């Protein structure tokens, strides 16, 4: 369900469970939700996806959510500081990695991030570090190898990781940085050149929100995500155990 639609929704009924999550979890969480619903007849899972910081801000502003799942620790730290999640329920549930991708039909002869400094490379996309976890991971990784500043003039900031993926898939940019799980969605449109060594591991935290009428099914969903069955579903979409 679109985030804007969630903002206009009345308080969820007892059998509705609202999950707000990072854009990179879209495909995997749809599958997780479907399985959870099949095991809990009558429960309807409503899903909202976007850049982690954007989704969090919507929760802070009053959007209904029973669970928040983000793509980095900084977003969840902000959620804890804003007192919109229960810190005792916070758990890391998945691991990912940042990869450099190019359009599948690219003829630039690129092999690694160092090649992005070549004159023939004009546009490189990644999430806006101010609000998008993959952008923050990318920034940290590129700073580590002294490539962040040289690439600033070529930057095309994306609002979330899926937008960055689309830019590359549509040949609108020469290269981009996305999560490995996102690149795997379009193997015929993009080609992975390199995995980036990030200073911090790419871990995904999840937590229960503290809203007054939180769904009674929220705890069960969180446990399902952490269970062997939930982890197996995530693994099918490329996520690894934390």
Predicted regions and their residues:
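Bacterial N-terminal signal peptides
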Residues: 1-8
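Bacterial Sec-dependent signal peptides at the C-terminal "C-region" and cleavage site
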Residues: 8-14
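Exported/periplasmic ABC-transporter solute-binding proteins
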Residues: 14-40, 44-49, 53, 57-63, ...
């Amino acid at each position: 369900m679109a985030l804007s639609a969630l903002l206009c929704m009345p308080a969820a009924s007892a059998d509705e469970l609202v999950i707000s999550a990072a854009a990179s979890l879209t495909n995997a969480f749809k599958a997780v939700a479907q399985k959870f619903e099949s095991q809990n007849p009558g429960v309807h899972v409503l899903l909202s996806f976007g850049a982690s910081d954007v989704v969090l801000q919507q929760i802070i502003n009053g959007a209904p959510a029973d669970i928040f799942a983000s793509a980095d620790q900084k977003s969840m730290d902000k959620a804890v500081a804003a007192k919109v999640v229960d810190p005792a329920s916070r758990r890391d549930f998945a691991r990912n990695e940042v990869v450099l991708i190019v359009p599948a039909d690219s003829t630039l002869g690129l092999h690694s991030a160092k090649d992005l400094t070549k004159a023939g490379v004009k546009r490189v996309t990644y999430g806006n570090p101010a609000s998008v976890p993959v952008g923050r991971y990318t920034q940290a990784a590129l700073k580590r190898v002294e490539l962040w500043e040289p690439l600033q003039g070529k930057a095309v900031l994306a609002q979330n990781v899926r937008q960055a993926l689309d830019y590359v898939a549509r040949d609108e940019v020469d290269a981009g940085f996305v999560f490995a799980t996102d690149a795997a969605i379009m193997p015929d449109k993009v080609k992975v050149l390199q995995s980036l060594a990030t200073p911090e591991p790419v871990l995904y935290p999840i937590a229960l929100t503290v809203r007054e009428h939180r769904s009674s099914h929220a705890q069960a969903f969180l446990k399902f995500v952490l269970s062997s069955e939930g982890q197996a579903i995530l693994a099918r979409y490329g996520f690894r155990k934390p």
